[in-house]
């Protein structure tokens, strides 16, 4: 036994660095073996990393769970009540909008059914012409025709020529061309055109000024200061692209001659390029409704409506009494009409007299025009609200029409409802099934509004759904302009002259899409963003909701994208 024990005790490796079985069986003090230390350290790190990963996973899960709970709480306690409140607000606004349109439509229909034409309500006998030529000419009142223009190279000949061809004694007519052009070549062309008509015996006055202060209002105000204007009893106004028929004055001036309380005769616009593209067809539908329903109703109800800025004839005395042309807003025409209306003067709209004009053919021109037409009235309403309420020469009902119907319902509530309901609330409803919209608000009211608008242009009734989607997009632009005007932001008084392309024969020769039309100039981020939001809502509704609401959302998103990339209208080089 001793021998075997001795042999076992003396079984020691000769190499001190080698590892024996006992090294693994018995604990070895730390640091006695580098290899052992490395393996032990790696194991510790692995265990520690695994523990850290489990800890991170638990932490992330806890954070996600808390975020989900927070989102559910925010959703149920904040967003859902807000959206339900928005639904109620839109219900009220939709009723207001529909009631206003039904009211105007009924008035317009009654006027037509009862044949209450202006010629039957007002005396408008032709101006008496005596046998003697000199006496006959003297019986015609002196009329001034004002044509303000700014770099109107494509159309200046149209308006000047049409004004000079008006059937009226030459010695009783003054054509005043107010040229604010900054292009020397255009200025020279306009001057020579005036000289050409002057040589034909027409009394044409070519007027310029040093600067463009006040834009169109400043130009008209400067023209009214000329000495020869004081001898004129009536003032007809034409924008550079308007072409009145030869008998324009023969049909309009008698209303003012025989009715001393009338201040303004407004005629209807007719569009020479309505069939040029889809954009002009959409505009024609809106403008026809404006003239046939809104202007007709305003004229019949309380002898007041917004002056359209052109194709109208004013009593010069009224312009002076009302304070002349003001440039405090971009709606100088509406400004003058309001001030004249508050003095008790009456207006008449004569829809049977049509004046040819041009619709904006490019989306850029149309957007700038709509900005001006939305921004100006909003600022004007802000400036004149208390003045309207304090007016003593108008009745309570006329004040109500001026404030509620003319401004609040038609220009503020209608614009806000159209954009917010169809482009914000409806797509958000897809993600919030808890929010319910009544069927009558969702379908019946929009359908009624569409049908009421279709009466303006019966020939385009097949485009009424497309017009509805188009107007929803333009409501975004109008709402933005309305807010800018009301709060007098940076572009509140921005005046950009609407680009005109001339008559249809010239338009046919224009290249529709030019190579130098840069992509960034056709890129409108806000429309594209909302279009993307609507497209996302449409996809979500198709995948997760059991309805066909995605059809409307998809259709509306397509129109947003079409306008966002300027795929409507004519594209021309600048």
Curated annotation (Swiss-Prot):
SUPFAM superfamilies: Nucleotide-diphospho-sugar transferases (SSF53448)
GO biological process, one term: cell wall organization
InterPro entries the record matches: Glyco_trans_2-like, Nucleotide-diphossugar_trans
EC nos: 2.4.1.32
Major site of localization recorded for this protein: Golgi
Entry's transmembrane regions: 87-107, 412-432, 437-457, 523-543, 548-568
Cellular component annotations (GO), alphabetically ordered: Golgi apparatus; Golgi membrane
Subcellular localization, as worded in the UniProt entry: Golgi apparatus membrane
Membrane topology term: Multi-pass membrane protein
Binding, substrate: 239, 241
Disulfide bonding pattern of the chain: none
One MF term in the entry's GO annotations: mannan synthase activity
Catalytic activity from the UniProt record: GDP-mannose + (glucomannan)n = GDP + (glucomannan)n+1
Pfam families named in the record: Glyco_trans_2_3 (PF13632)
Active site: 180, 333
Origin: domain of life: Eukaryota
Keyword match Lipoprotein: no
UniProt KW keywords: Cell wall biogenesis/degradation, Glycosyltransferase, Golgi apparatus, Membrane, Transferase, Transmembrane, Transmembrane helix
Family in the record: Belongs to the glycosyltransferase 2 family. Plant cellulose synthase-like A subfamily.
Function description: Probable mannan synthase which consists of a 4-beta-mannosyltransferase activity on mannan using GDP-mannose. The beta-1,4-mannan product is the backbone for galactomannan synthesis by galactomannan galactosyltransferase. Galactomannan is a noncellulosic polysaccharides of plant cell wall.
Name of the protein in its database record: Probable glucomannan 4-beta-mannosyltransferase 6
Organism lineage string: Eukaryota, Viridiplantae, Streptophyta, Embryophyta, Tracheophyta
């Amino acid at each position: 036994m001793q021998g075997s024990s001795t042999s076992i005790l003396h079984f020691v490796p000769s190499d001190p660095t080698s590892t024996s079985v006992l090294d693994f069986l018995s604990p070895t003090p730390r640091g006695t073996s580098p290899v052992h230390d490395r393996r032990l350290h790696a194991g510790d790190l692995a265990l520690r990393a695994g523990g850290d990963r489990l800890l991170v996973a638990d932490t992330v899960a806890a954070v996600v769970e808390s975020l989900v709970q927070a989102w559910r709480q925010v959703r149920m306690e904040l967003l859902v009540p807000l959206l339900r409140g928005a639904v109620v607000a839109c219900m009220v606004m939709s009723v207001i909008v529909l009631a206003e349109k039904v009211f105007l439509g009924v008035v317009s229909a009654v006027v037509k059914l009862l044949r209450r034409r202006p010629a039957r309500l007002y005396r408008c006998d032709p101006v008496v012409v005596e046998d003697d030529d000199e006496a006959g000419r003297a019986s015609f009142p002196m009329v001034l025709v004002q044509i303000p223009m700014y770099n109107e190279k494509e159309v200046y000949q149209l308006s000047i020529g049409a004004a000079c061809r008006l059937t009226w004694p030459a010695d009783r007519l003054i054509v005043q061309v107010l040229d604010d052009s900054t292009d020397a070549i255009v200025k020279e062309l306009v001057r020579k055109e005036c000289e050409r008509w002057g040589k034909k015996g027409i009394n044409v006055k070519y007027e310029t000024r040093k600067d463009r202060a006040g834009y169109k209002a400043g130009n008209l105000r400067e023209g009214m200061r000329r000495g020869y204007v004081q001898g004129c009893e009536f003032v007809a106004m034409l924008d550079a692209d308007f072409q009145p028929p030869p008998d324009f004055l023969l049909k309009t001036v008698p209303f003012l001659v025989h009715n001393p309380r009338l201040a303004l005769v407004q005629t209807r616009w007719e569009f020479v390029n309505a069939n040029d593209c889809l954009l002009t067809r959409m505009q024609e539908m809106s403008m026809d409704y404006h003239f046939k329903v809104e202007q007709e109703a305003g004229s019949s109800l309380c002898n007041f409506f917004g002056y359209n800025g052109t194709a109208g004839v004013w009593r010069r005395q009224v312009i002076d009494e009302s304070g002349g042309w003001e440039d405090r807003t971009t709606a100088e025409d509406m400004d003058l009409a309001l001030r004249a209306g508050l003095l008790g003067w009456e207006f008449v709209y004569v829809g049977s007299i049509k004046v040819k004009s041009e619709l904006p053919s490019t989306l850029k021109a149309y957007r700038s025009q709509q900005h001006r037409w939305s921004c100006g009235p909003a600022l004007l309403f802000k400036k004149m609200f208390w003045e309207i309420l304090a007016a003593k020469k108008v009745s309570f009902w006329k004040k109500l029409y001026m404030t509620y119907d003319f401004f609040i319902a038609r220009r503020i509530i209608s614009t806000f409802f159209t954009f917010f309901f169809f482009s914000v609330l409806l797509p958000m409803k897809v993600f919030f099934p808890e929010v319910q919209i009544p069927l009558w608000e969702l379908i019946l009211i929009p359908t009624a509004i569409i049908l009421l608008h279709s009466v303006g242009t019966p020939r385009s009734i097949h485009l009424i759904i497309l017009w509805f989607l188009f107007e929803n997009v333009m409501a975004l632009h109008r709402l933005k302009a309305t807010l800018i005007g009301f709060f007098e932001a940076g572009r509140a008084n921005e005046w950009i002259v609407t680009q005109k392309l001339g008559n249809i024969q010239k338009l046919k020769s224009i290249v529709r899409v030019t190579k130098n039309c840069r992509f960034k100039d056709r890129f409108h981020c806000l429309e594209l963003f909302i279009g993307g939001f609507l497209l996302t809502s449409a996809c979500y509704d198709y995948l997760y909701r059991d309805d066909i609401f995605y059809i409307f959302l998809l259709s509306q998103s397509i129109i947003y994208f079409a306008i966002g990339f300027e795929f409507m209208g004519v594209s021309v080089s600048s």
